Amino acid sequence: MAFLVEKQLFKALFSFFLLVLLFSDTVLSFRKTIDQKKPCKHFSFYFHDILYDGDNVANATSAAIVSPPGLGNFKFGKFVIFDGPITMDKNYLSKPVARAQGFYFYDMKMDFNSWFSYTLVFNSTEHKGTLNIMGADLMMEPTRDLSVVGGTGDFFMARGIATFVTDLFQGAKYFRVKMDIKLYECY
């Protein structure tokens, strides 16, 4: 009798594990594979930032809402809100293809470093929707990678990398960054 119970228990467990194995194989076979070498979408844009200095109200695209507390020479603690144009070329006066809306703050006392969190808002005939980008901008590095963590509209649930290259830096008043955006998950 015990042998019969063990045999039935073995059959039940074997059947259960076989079903789990078949189900997990079915789920995995429908999973989207990601080719990390080839992005599904690729863009190059320029982000322009003109920091408000008290005299440039009409042209300013960003403003410091928290000034640095004086803990060193690297603007540690400075918090900036921005709404800047994104263009296809280096010209600030070119027609914007999007707006970069968000913030950055300086978060390192021993070197220039900032942390960005912003949304690219597209509202053109070519693209509609948003891309959400965030991450550390190690400003002294020649290139920096930030994460594309989502999007809406044409960029629904997009994920990828935004590579920053400082194209122009004019002190505390103006900078231009080339953004090379590669999306690896597109739906």
UniProtKB/Swiss-Prot annotation:
Record-stated family: Belongs to the plant dirigent protein family.
Oligomer status and interactors: Homodimer.
Cystine pairings recorded for this chain: C40-C186
InterPro entries found in the cross-reference section: Allene_oxi_cyc_Dirigent, Dirigent
UniProt subcellular location: Secreted, Extracellular space, Apoplast
Protein name: Dirigent protein 6
GO biological process: (-)-pinoresinol biosynthetic process; regulation of catalytic activity
Molecular function, one GO term: protein homodimerization activity
Originating organism: Arabidopsis thaliana (Mouse-ear cress)
Expressed in which tissues: Expressed in roots, cotyledon veins, leaf trichomes, flowers, siliques, and meristems. Present in interfascicular/vascular cambia and developing xylem.
GO cellular component terms attached to this protein's record: apoplast
Location (main, coarse): secreted
Signal peptide: 1-29
Organism superkingdom: Eukaryota
Chain positions carrying an annotated carbohydrate: N59, N123
Keywords: Apoplast, Disulfide bond, Glycoprotein, Secreted, Signal
Function, as annotated: Dirigent proteins impart stereoselectivity on the phenoxy radical-coupling reaction, yielding optically active lignans from two molecules of coniferyl alcohol in the biosynthesis of lignans, flavonolignans, and alkaloids and thus plays a central role in plant secondary metabolism. Enantiocomplementary dirigent protein that mediates the laccase-catalyzed enantioselective oxidative phenol coupling of (E)-coniferyl alcohol to (-)-pinoresinol.
